[in-house]
C-alpha cells in the first residue's frame, strides 16, 4: 500500500505533528514500506494457529500488592500549589 502526501498529512494532523516538506516525503516512503511488510504478513496462512499475545510461556512478572502506611492526605494536599477539596488541581493536559 502506498501512502501519498495527503495520507501522511492526515496522520500527522491526528497525531498533532507539524511536518516539514522533507519529513513528509521521507515518512511517505517509510510508512509505505512498513505497510508493505504488513501486507506480506497478511498472506501468511495461520489456519489452525491459536491466537496469542505471547508466543513463549511466561509466568507473571508482577509483584503482589503490599499495603504500606502512606502519607497523611492533608499533609500532601498542603504541599500542592493548587487544590480543590480533597484533590490536587492541575492544568488541563488534554484538549
UniProtKB/Swiss-Prot annotation:
InterPro entries: Asp/Glu-ADT_sf_sub_c, GatC. It is an enzyme of class 6 (ligase). Its EC number is 6.3.5.-. The keyword ATP-binding applies. It catalyses: L-glutamyl-tRNA(Gln) + L-glutamine + ATP + H2O = L-glutaminyl-tRNA(Gln) + L-glutamate + ADP + phosphate + H(+); L-aspartyl-tRNA(Asn) + L-glutamine + ATP + H2O = L-asparaginyl-tRNA(Asn) + L-glutamate + ADP + phosphate + 2 H(+). Allows the formation of correctly charged Asn-tRNA(Asn) or Gln-tRNA(Gln) through the transamidation of misacylated Asp-tRNA(Asn) or Glu-tRNA(Gln) in organisms which lack either or both of asparaginyl-tRNA or glutaminyl-tRNA synthetases. The reaction takes place in the presence of glutamine and ATP through an activated phospho-Asp-tRNA(Asn) or phospho-Glu-tRNA(Gln). This is Aspartyl/glutamyl-tRNA(Asn/Gln) amidotransferase subunit C.
